[in-house]
């Protein structure tokens, strides 16, 4: 196993939905993440199930199955504090929580994967390595 495959990949909701349902970038994303450990905050759980419900109630099971394959970070005081104070103020609240969780990881984080332009810019501003395989 290569060094990069042992490093964690933080994924946000825009990436997660591409793992659940076929979208333009789904195949490239799956290949990019193959065998790599995935992690995200508990916010992803809420966002993913809500996205599944918008598609179809039967899609909730697909999202939940994928969520079980990932490590999940709970939101604690330091994450809330960092997210609350995150600059610039235009960073959306849920994005700020994702970014704070990624920054506070005590594991070897390789990258954050997102397909959302605002999230990408905010992550870069936070000093994170960002990718959007396509």
Predicted regions and their residues:
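Alpha-helix capping/helix-boundary segments
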Residues: 15-16, 44, 79, 98, ...
């Amino acid at each position: 196993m290569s060094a990069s495959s042992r490093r964690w990949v933080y994924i946000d909701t825009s990436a997660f939905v591409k793992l659940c349902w076929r979208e333009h970038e789904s195949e490239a994303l799956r290949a990019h993440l193959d065998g790599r450990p995935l992690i995200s905050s508990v916010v992803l759980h809420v966002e993913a199930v809500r996205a599944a419900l918008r598609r179809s109630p039967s899609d909730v099971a697909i999202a939940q199955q994928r969520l079980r394959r990932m490590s999940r970070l709970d939101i604690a005081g330091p994450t809330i504090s960092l997210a609350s104070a995150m600059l610039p103020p235009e960073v959306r609240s849920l994005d700020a929580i994702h970014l704070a969780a990624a920054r506070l990881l005590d594991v070897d984080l390789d990258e954050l994967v997102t397909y959302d332009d605002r999230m990408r810019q905010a992550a870069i501003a936070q000093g994170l390595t960002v990718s959007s395989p396509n």
